[in-house]
Structures are given as C-alpha cells and as structure tokens.
Amino acid sequence: MNTSFENRAKLACLYAGGVWGLFWIPLRALEEAGINGLWVTFVYFLVPTIFLIPVGIWRLKYLKLGGFNLQLTGMLSGGALMLYATSIVYTDVVRAMLLFYLTPVWGTILGRLFLNENITPLRIISMIIAIIGMLTIFGLGVKFPIPQNVGDWMGVASGLMWAVASLRIRLNQNASAIDMALGFFF
C-alpha cells in the first residue's frame, strides 16, 4: 500500500471517528431548542434526506436493480442509525454509545452463525468483558441488570440492528457504497 493512500485512509478514519464521536451534540442542541422526542431525530435526518433526493433520483435505476436485498439492508442500517440517534435523546449519551458499541458482540455471533467465522479466544475474552460492561451499565449488583429506560432499549436494539445490517452488507458486496448509503434515507 502506498504512503499517500495510507495517509488518506488514516485521515478518513480520524474524520469519521470525530464525526461519530460528536454525533450527539446537534441532537442535544435540537432538544435544548425545544424540539422533543422523536421530532429531534426527524429534524436531524431531514436535512441530509432533502440534499440526497437528487442523488436518489439520479441513482433510481440502480436502486431498483438492487431489489429487495438492497432495500432491506438500507432499511436495517438506516433504522439502526435512527434508533441510535433517538436513544441519545432518551437516555444518557454515554449509555447510548456504550450500548450501541456492543455491535461487535452481536456481529461476532452473527458471523459465526451465518458466515461460519471462527471465534478466537481473544474475541471470546473481549465479548465477555463487553457483556460485563453492559451488565454494569444496567446496574449489576445493585438491581436486576436490564435496560432502565426506552433509550437504553433503543441503544441495545440499534447495535443489534447495525450488526444485522453489517452482515447483510458483507453478504451483498456487489452493491455500490452510494446505493447502500442512499438506503439509509430512502
């Protein structure tokens, strides 16, 4: 791999990590502006949806060719993102993020079940630590460790849904990235 490509890849990862880490700030700003509940998520995703309408029209032929598989994958990934965004509104940001980031646990299990991937001892240890972390968030030792509010449930569901969407993306690698991204919104 050449250095220029590696540097661009590193910058892309840095940028994506920064955007993902700051994702919650506009959601909370909308909430502080007086927009409540699901309306926060609706308004948050309305702007990119409006900007993507011309791209969706331009790619309509390819979206139709992708058929139900592409549409289902798009609905799952878009639904996961919507659940995640809404979970931030209904629970603490840290709880929402940590519960969403159980995605590797669900992804490992799905990879084993549907792709026959091996689960290494290191992966098992990391999954156990992640589950212990989740149980701690839910109050292990203080009360029965279950999600405490609708935002917690949405955080867990968003991570699970994202893992299913990621599995579908791996199974349908012939779809273009732009069509997959459009599936988030349409």
Residue ranges with predicted function:
Residues 59-68, 112-122, 167-180:
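Membrane-interface helix-boundary motifs at transmembrane edges
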Residues 11, 15, 42-43, 72, ...:
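Hydrophobic core positions of alpha-helical segments in small-molecule transporters
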Residues 8-16, 60-83, 149-158:
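Loop-to-transmembrane-helix transition segments
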Residues 52, 122-140:
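Hydrophobic transmembrane alpha-helices of multi-pass small-molecule transport proteins
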Residues 56-59, 86, 103-128:
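C-terminal transmembrane-helix exit sites in multi-pass transporters
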Residues 32-39, 83-99, 175-178:
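Structural motif at transmembrane-helix junctions in multi-pass transporters
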